Amino acid sequence: MRSWLAPSVPKLAGAGPRLRLWDSADRIIRPVTPGRTATMYVCGITPYDATHLGHAATYLAFDLVHRLWLDAGHQVAYAQNITDVDDPLLERADRDHRDWQELAAEQIELFRTDMSALRVLPPHEYVGVTESVGLVVAMVEKLLANQSAYVVAEGEYPDVYHRIAATEDFGYVSGYGREEMAQVFRERGGDPDRPGKADPLDALLWRAARPGEPSWPSPFGPGRPGWHVECSAIALDRIGFGFDVQGGGSDLVFPHHEFSAAHAQAQHGAGAADEHRRFARNYVHAGMIGLDGEKMSKSLGNLVFVSALRERGVDPSAIRLALFAGHYRADRSWDQGLLREAQERLARWRHAASLASGPAAHDVVARMREHLANDLDTPKALAALDSWSLEAAAHGGGDQEAPALVARAADALLGVQLTP
């Protein structure tokens, strides 16, 4: 599946410092140590209600990771899926009397348009689940063969499940205890009460065909992929086992990332005691976005959409700055005051970048690099550029190259355009 056109990224002199990120599994900030090519998998959208600000905040956070790796001199291999067949999509299509494939295609195109407007660097592999059913079938076959999976015999539908007991160190991604797992599993799409399961927490790998639902053939009967195994199979196929960063929103820590890792490690016979034997070497998660102090969610009907902001004439660079005003890991709130402050900040920066000269800027670029490399500390990076722009506006400066350097740095590191 095609992604979207990549924006140009200016090259800054020298190389940025090594990136350090909070690893959700180990619960520490530590250096990310890729080889020449840095590898990243970020879970994509289920294509309905795209693109709300929660989506945008997540993909902007990992856009920073992408940009900082490029600035540090790495090549980047970045894969992202699209969950273009799943219960929520089918339910929305049924509610709205739409063909589910048409709804998915419409929403995927809207997402592409929004990501392009926000100047998000596209993934190199942008993969729909419907394109990848063969990968999932092959993986489920392997899990059945090594007894990490089983077919539920009870009931009308022979669904296939993963045995959590088959995965060494199950639970290392979230750090949850059994009781917390059970609660969150039920809240986020799990089926602990399904008769015939070996363990209530065992996760669905293959949903046997039901009347009126899309299905594909497989050796274990027609059906469609479970949610978690889709990402396991796509990531293993496109960037391989033991990639550098698994990314997503914090609501994916459990069960999604926990089970994606469990499926992959059950296939590979690997454990989590050593980061080099994990599905991903680092698990990185972005916080949730609320609206006016309340949780932003589909169920509450208070989603704010990127496309709606753009239709109102909001500059996408201002949207980036508004979301960068808080730390990516923090749960934070969107309101009109936040957007207004971002628009004012963007105007100040653009004015300073338009001056014929300004204060020397090499130090501010170095500070931006250091702050961003320290677990994507955007508030401090923005403050560094604020200081330079205020000084430039108030007192000028004798460095004729400084405004252009600052504009290139804002573009390369933050994806924010200051000049036409």
From Swiss-Prot:
GO terms for biological process: cysteinyl-tRNA aminoacylation; mycothiol biosynthetic process. A motif ('KMSKS' region) lies at residues 295-299. Binds 1 zinc ion per subunit. A motif ('ERGGDP' region) lies at residues 187-192. Zn(2+) binds at residues 43, 231, 256. It catalyses: 1D-myo-inositol 2-amino-2-deoxy-alpha-D-glucopyranoside + L-cysteine + ATP = 1D-myo-inositol 2-(L-cysteinylamino)-2-deoxy-alpha-D-glucopyranoside + AMP + diphosphate + H(+). A motif ('HIGH' region) lies at residues 45-55. The keyword Ligase applies. Its EC number is 6.3.1.13. It comes from the Bacteria. GO terms for molecular function: ATP binding; cysteine-glucosaminylinositol ligase activity; cysteine-tRNA ligase activity; zinc ion binding. Catalyzes the ATP-dependent condensation of GlcN-Ins and L-cysteine to form L-Cys-GlcN-Ins. Monomer. HAMAP family: MshC (MF_01697). This is L-cysteine:1D-myo-inositol 2-amino-2-deoxy-alpha-D-glucopyranoside ligase. It comes from Segniliparus rotundus (strain ATCC BAA-972 / CDC 1076 / CIP 108378 / DSM 44985 / JCM 13578). The gene is mshC.
